């Protein structure tokens, strides 16, 4: 069975499904045909097993794997991701943030080769690092 290559399936594993997080993901992808598969997993399955389950159940060719602590700040993600794959059909995978050269094994140590935006919360304070304009 051929899957849909013009839409996106989002696969998320979480210990407890949070409807506000689900709504946030839905808003950021903001396309009526974006499929969001959120699996509640208290540790009985590995993350790989959950992602493989999502791959089997998804209806789209383009699949996004997300951790449940990832907060997206770019909206309208579905058409942006689809356009990126259309522009670069040779791509098999796209990363939102990372580095294109890794020598130490710690991605954050080689700042000149980093791209994207990474945010995190430490001791209740939000931190956002902008490494480049990124693809979105």
Task: Label each residue range with its predicted role.
Residues 1-28, 33-38:
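N-proximal low-complexity "stem/linker" segments adjacent to membrane-targeting elements
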Residues 40-41, 71:
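Preference for well-ordered, secondary-structure-rich cores of eukaryotic proteins
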Residues 20-27, 49, 53, 76-83:
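Alpha-helical elements of Rossmann-like donor-binding domains used by nucleotide-donor carbohydrate transfer enzymes
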Residues 66-68:
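Active-site acidic Asp-centered loop
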Residues 71, 75-118:
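Conserved donor NDP-sugar-binding/catalytic core segment of glycosyltransferases
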Residues 42-58:
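Glycine-rich, basic loop-to-helix element that forms the pyrophosphate-binding segment
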Residues 63:
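Short aromatic/hydrophobic "clamp" motif used to bind/position activated sugar donors
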Residues 113-136:
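Short, flexible, basic/aromatic active-site loop/helix in glycosyltransferases
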